[in-house]
Amino acid sequence: MSYSVGQVAGFAGVTVRTLHHYDDIGLLVPSERSHAGHRRYSDADLDRLQQILFYRELGFPLDEVAALLDDPAADPRAHLRRQHELLSARIGKLQKMAAAVEQAMEARSMGINLTPEEKFEVFGDFDPDQYEEEVRERWGNTDAYRQSKEKTASYTKEDWQRIQDEADELTRRFVALMDAGEPADSEGAMDAAEDHRQGIARNHYDCGYEMHTCLGEMYVSDERFTRNIDAAKPGLAAYMRDAILANAVRHTP
């Protein structure tokens, strides 16, 4: 069975112009031509196109794709194994980037407009500017992002120091509660969680209980947050998450 260039373009999600270009450069030459001279693609041609698109998705230039596919020592299974390895590596990298984007958003919501050195001092080895473009792309349309940018635009270094001092005091309160053996759903722990929520709302953006619990989950799901928080006391991130959740339940009708 053979397929027209329009059919193949529809199958593959590419343009007819792209297929013409692949033919012109010898990357994907149709196996057949109709009596009228129109391109006709076989199933084998579609297999090759699939390989081309895999490699293109992985960022390979067309000349390298051609060299890989025309290598007489490689068979289709070898290409699939290679592509699987490359795609798995890319997935891992994207997962790490997604986690970094979430942390960058939280960093921005906390108003980090200091020097790079000061940012590192507050957040350890994470630099929010590294993923600024991804932060804007993913979160730029959210109310929280806009509120935080507007509210913090005029903050001075003294304002940031005050906010950091408040955060440090809250950390000491949580640590003291843990040291005293107070459970995360105790009045003291829930009160500390409520002060944490109100601090975010006061200094950055409207932070309801649902959003607050999402932040609490991030403290344990993102290892960089966990590492930064647990530096004060091992297990603190999970304790804060549990206290935040208990406080949200307390205030939910």
From Swiss-Prot:
PROSITE patterns: HTH_MERR_1, HTH_MERR_2. GO terms for molecular function: DNA binding; DNA-binding transcription factor activity. It comes from the Bacteria. Residues 1-71 form the HTH merR-type domain. InterPro entries: DNA-bd_dom_put_sf, MerR-type_HTH_dom, MerR_fam, TipA-like_antibiotic-bd, TipAS_dom. The keyword Flavoprotein does not apply. Keywords: Activator, DNA-binding, Transcription, Transcription regulation. SMART domains: HTH_MERR. Transmembrane segments: none annotated. Residues 5-24 bind DNA. Transcriptional activator. Is activated when bound to the antibiotic thiostrepton. Homodimer. This is HTH-type transcriptional activator TipA. It comes from Streptomyces lividans.
